[in-house]
Amino acid sequence: MSSEPGRVMALDVGERRIGVALSDPTRMLASPLTTIRAVPRSTALKRILTLIRDYQVTALVVGLPLTMNGDIGPQATLVQQFVDELRPLIDIPIFFVDERLTTVAAERMMIDLKIKPEQRRARIDEVAASIILQDFLDSQR
């Protein structure tokens, strides 16, 4: 990743929802930001573009859900198709990160924090995105 200062955004793209996380300006800490509806696709893309602009994002990290043996399966293909639609609309670097088991880790974290089940369902995607982003930020140090 470039040494250009600024926030990094992460996306956890699913069929129905997209979790969004954002780093602090120093790129040390990732935090859940929001969850947006993945459909209609045009609305989701507009919302992501607005967030990128509003938070002055300088890089994008996208979780790629590889299969357990590291292959690209149907879910990863869905994510790649989404990024193919997003890429021409933005002028910042995009990084794919292996996101196997991040949703499981997010669920466990929220259970440990005693977050109620209905709140967990509402925030699972953005928490997973923050785990993806924090792993990426840590790997860049």
Curated annotation (Swiss-Prot):
<dbReference type="GO" id="GO:0000967">
    <property type="term" value="P:rRNA 5'-end processing"/>
</dbReference>
<dbReference type="InterPro" id="IPR005227">
    <property type="entry name" value="YqgF"/>
</dbReference>
<protein>
    <recommendedName>
        <fullName>Putative pre-16S rRNA nuclease</fullName>
        <ecNumber>3.1.-.-</ecNumber>
    </recommendedName>
</protein>
<keyword id="KW-0540">Nuclease</keyword>
<keyword id="KW-0378">Hydrolase</keyword>
<dbReference type="GO" id="GO:0004518">
    <property type="term" value="F:nuclease activity"/>
</dbReference>
<dbReference type="Pfam" id="PF03652">
    <property type="entry name" value="RuvX"/>
</dbReference>
<dbReference type="InterPro" id="IPR012337">
    <property type="entry name" value="RNaseH-like_sf"/>
</dbReference>
<dbReference type="GO" id="GO:0005829">
    <property type="term" value="C:cytosol"/>
</dbReference>
<dbReference type="InterPro" id="IPR006641">
    <property type="entry name" value="YqgF/RNaseH-like_dom"/>
</dbReference>
<keyword id="KW-0690">Ribosome biogenesis</keyword>
<comment type="function">
    <text>Could be a nuclease involved in processing of the 5'-end of pre-16S rRNA.</text>
</comment>
<keyword id="KW-0963">Cytoplasm</keyword>
<dbReference type="InterPro" id="IPR037027">
    <property type="entry name" value="YqgF/RNaseH-like_dom_sf"/>
</dbReference>
<comment type="similarity">
    <text>Belongs to the YqgF nuclease family.</text>
</comment>
